[in-house]
Design a protein with these regions (language model features):
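Hydrophobic, aromatic-enriched alpha-helical segments typical of multi-pass transmembrane helices
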Residues: 1-209
Length: 209
């Protein structure tokens, strides 16, 4: 199997992953992350299962991209791929928690996930200072290097960077930004990642030497 065929096969990971990222924020119960009724609902489980599946699919897509690009990649691109991989580990871990453990907590100890519960008071430092920045910077860095490599068009880069930046706009109960920021963040970032997969699938070329 050639490197090009591996890239085209694994590019489906970026396409599906982008769809799942968009699904995560668009399906998620509107208005807030808090509340036992939200956290235990089928809608919540569907949204955060998309969150978890997005991480798995995007990691699979990155494997093919690494096969194609890493042998001749510069330091910047290599670092961006490693950062994106780390971002997917963190993103997948939080997705496993919110899709499986969170609904159990909501059903059996719902007061924990209320706005004034232990899940949000004090505010979760891991989410604010590690998970969100790593995800946002990891996505933006990978998309930027793919644009520089002439794989991704500028429109996709802009959509992805704007979406990644919106991850830094926390909504209720973490802060007061409108929920539309969260919904749009995943929609735009997911569009850009799916666009990357489409570009790789239909125009995969060997790494520049």
């Amino acid at each position: 199997m050639t490197r090009q065929s591996i890239v085209r096969m694994t590019s489906a990971g970026f396409i599906l992953g982008g769809v799942f990222v968009a699904g995560w924020t668009l399906i998620s119960p509107w208005g807030s992350f808090a509340g036992a009724a939200r956290g235990g609902s089928a809608q919540w489980i569907a949204a955060h299962s998309s969150h978890y599946l997005a991480a798995l699919c995007l990691t699979f897509g990155l494997l093919g991209l690494a096969v194609q690009r890493l042998p001749a990649a510069g330091r910047g691109e290599a670092f961006a791929q490693l950062l994106f991989l780390f971002a997917m580990w963190v993103y997948g871990g939080t997705g496993a928690i919110t899709s499986r453990m969170w609904p159990l907590i909501a059903h059996h100890a719902g007061e924990i996930v209320e706005a004034d519960g232990a899940m949000f008071k004090p505010q979760p430092e891991f989410l604010q200072f590690i998970a969100v920045p790593v995800l946002a910077v990891g996505v933006a860095a990978l998309l930027f290097t793919m644009w520089r490599a002439r794989i991704l068009p500028l429109a996709a880069l802009v959509a992805g960077v704007v979406g990644a930046a919106m991850f830094f706009a926390p909504t209720a109960p973490l802060a007061g930004f409108p929920w539309i920021f969260f919904a749009a963040s995943g929609a735009l970032a997911g569009l850009a990642l799916a666009w990357l997969g489409w570009s790789l699938r239909h125009g995969a070329t060997p790494a520049d030497s």
